Amino acid sequence: VLSNMTNTYVDFAYTPDKTERGLSWGGFVDERRSFSLLPYDIYRSVRWDDHGRIRDISTLPDGKTPLKARENVIGVQAQLWTETVRCFDHVTSYVFPKVCGVFERAWNASPSWEGTTQADDPAFLQELDRYYSTVVSHEIPYYDEMQIAYRQRKN
C-alpha cells in the first residue's frame, strides 16, 4: 500500500504560507498534488516543486529503481499524523477536500494522462479541471450540509 509524503500526507500544509496550519518538512499537499498521484509511476507524481513551479517530470525517474511489479501495489493510503491536531475540526480541515484526490487515484490508479511527460500536459489539466468541478459541485455542498469543517481556498 503506497503512501508517499508528496501526495498523500494530509497533515501537510496546503501551501507554503507560514500562517497555514500543517507540517511542511516534506513539502505541501493540496487537492492538485493528491490528484496527481501515480501509484504505478510514483516518481512522476511530483509535478510541482514546493514553490508551485512546474517540474520536468520526464527526467524524475532517471537513476531511480523502476517499479516493475504492478501487481505488488494493492492500494494507496492517506496519512494523518497528529502532532499538530488539537481538535476534530483540525482533522477535517486537513483531510477535506485534499483526500478526494487520493480517493480518485485509489479508484483509478492508471489515469489517461499517466504516460504524459510534461507536468502541464493538456490531458492532465483537462482531467484536473473535471476533478475540481466535481469536488466543487458535489463534495463541498455535502461538507456544508453535514457541517464538516473543511479547508477553504484562500484568495
Each model region followed by its residue ranges:
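Substrate-binding groove of N-acetylhexosamine-processing glycoside hydrolases
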Residues: 1-155
